[in-house]
């Protein structure tokens, strides 16, 4: 009898083991459902800090979403949000290649990026211009930009969307405020990173708005994004002796110019900076020399939500600024749109999900930003609240919150 029961016992043990394995595997399988949001931008090169900060902000947002239960898909199942971020090195060709690689993935519904305007413009150019146009073979993939800020780019394609502030509105308001509050400032000198699309475009806005505010534009100095010597340009400023110097430059060359201004004893009555330089990178690089500089920005840690977002980014060794603040909010917005529009996030629903995401982004009239409500325009741009910050004692302080907000 003992010999006859041994096979039966072994069989029962094997069945029990198989059932236990199945039961243990079931939760693991359930947890494997993911929604992947891709990003791309500059993670190397001179402006790499912006891409690195965007990636960190996106991952911090995803972490908050996952801790709260993840994303609810169209079939009611829960999915984990995963971020994958590609490096385009602020290079147009690499940006195009990055977006094509993303669009070729069977799990890619939408992407965030890029960092640089000189990448965004050609990238938007490969997208289908008018959604549903069978004669247009352009890429049919929704792109929600967080950083690239050159004006008007989203109108290039109905698949392109941006969550960047209007620098035209920001510098118009700033120059009007300077005119009203600083009657002693009458002359203007500009400095610009001549080889960078964003710097060039914004400098033209600064100069035009300064002229409209009644300031006398006396000239400009030019340098390149990768330059490290600015003695000639600062000598030009010194000879001009203007009341205001406006620098349309990113933190790296802004600090280089400010240090050279200190060395040569150039002390204008007022310093104005580029939106992108309203960052901790500027203060870490040249807080003493940047003392007093005024910059318009669409981010400052002045609301509970903004403080929370900044702390989440800091936990991943990143600083929050107007650019990656947008990257963070883009992730929360996409999570909401996935749920409201019942996206399935499966390979067999890929094209339908992309179309739903495009239509959802296009239909948005308003989103919630870190400083308040953000309006959406018909050409897929954002109307964001902003304020003016000033560098004081190694920190950014709010100088003014314009009434236009």
Predicted regions and their residues:
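Bacterial N-terminal signal peptides that target proteins for export
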Residues: 2-15
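Sec/Tat signal peptide C-region and signal peptidase I cleavage site
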Residues: 24-30
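Extracytoplasmic "Venus flytrap"
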Residues: 38-59, 86-92, 115, 191-201, ...
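Beta-alpha junction/loop-to-helix N-cap segments that form part of ligand/metal-binding clefts
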Residues: 49-56, 71-153, 163, 223-230
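Short, polar/charged alpha-helical segment
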Residues: 50-74, 204-211
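Extracytoplasmic ligand/sensor domains, especially the bilobed periplasmic-binding protein
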Residues: 108-220, 269-295
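Extracellular/periplasmic periplasmic-binding protein-like sensory domains
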Residues: 261-331, 339-342, 391, 396-404
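Segments of small-molecule ligand-sensing domains
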Residues: 315-324, 335-398
């Amino acid at each position: 009898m003992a010999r006859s029961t041994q096979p039966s016992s072994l069989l029962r043990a094997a069945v029990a083991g198989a059932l236990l394995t199945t039961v243990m595997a079931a939760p693991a399988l359930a947890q494997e459902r993911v929604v992947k949001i891709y990003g791309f931008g500059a993670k190397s090169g001179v402006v790499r800090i912006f891409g690195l900060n965007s990636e960190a902000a996106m991952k911090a947002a995803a972490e908050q979403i996952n801790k709260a239960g993840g994303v609810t898909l169209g079939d009611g199942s829960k999915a984990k949000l995963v971020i994958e971020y590609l490096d385009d090195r602020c290079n147009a060709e690499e940006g195009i290649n990055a977006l094509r690689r993303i669009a070729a993935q069977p799990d890619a519904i939408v992407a965030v990026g890029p960092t640089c305007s000189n990448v965004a413009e050609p990238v938007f150019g490969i997208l289908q211009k008018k959604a549903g146009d069978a004669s247009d073979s352009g890429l049919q993939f929704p792109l929600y930009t967080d950083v690239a800020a050159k004006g008007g780019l989203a109108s290039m394609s109905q698949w392109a969307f941006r969550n960047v502030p209007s620098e035209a509105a920001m510098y118009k308001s700033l120059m009007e405020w300077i005119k009203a509050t600083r009657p002693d400032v009458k002359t203007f000198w500009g400095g610009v990173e001549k080889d960078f699309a964003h710097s060039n475009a914004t400098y033209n806005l600064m100069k035009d708005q300064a002229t409209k505010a009644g300031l006398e534009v006396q000239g400009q100095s030019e340098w390149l994004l990768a330059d490290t010597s600015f003695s000639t340009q600062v000598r030009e400023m010194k000879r001009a002796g203007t009341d205001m110097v406006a620098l349309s430059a990113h933190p790296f060359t802004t600090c280089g110019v400010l240090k050279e201004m200190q060395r040569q004893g150039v002390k204008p009555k007022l310093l104005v900076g580029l939106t992108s330089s309203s960052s901790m990178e500027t203060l870490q690089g040249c807080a003493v020399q940047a003392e007093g500089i005024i910059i318009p920005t669409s981010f400052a840690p002045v609301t509970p939500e903004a403080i929370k977002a900044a702390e989440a980014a800091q936990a991943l060794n990143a600083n929050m600024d107007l650019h990656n603040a947008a990257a963070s909010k883009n992730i929360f917005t996409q999570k909401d749109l996935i749920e409201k529009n019942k996206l399935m996030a499966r390979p067999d629903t890929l094209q339908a999900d992309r179309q739903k995401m495009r239509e959802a982004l296009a239909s948005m009239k308003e989103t919630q930003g870190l400083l308040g409500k953000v309006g959406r325009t018909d050409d897929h741009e954002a109307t964001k609240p902003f304020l003016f910050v000033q560098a004081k004692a190694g920190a950014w302080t709010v100088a003014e919150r314009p009434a236009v907000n």
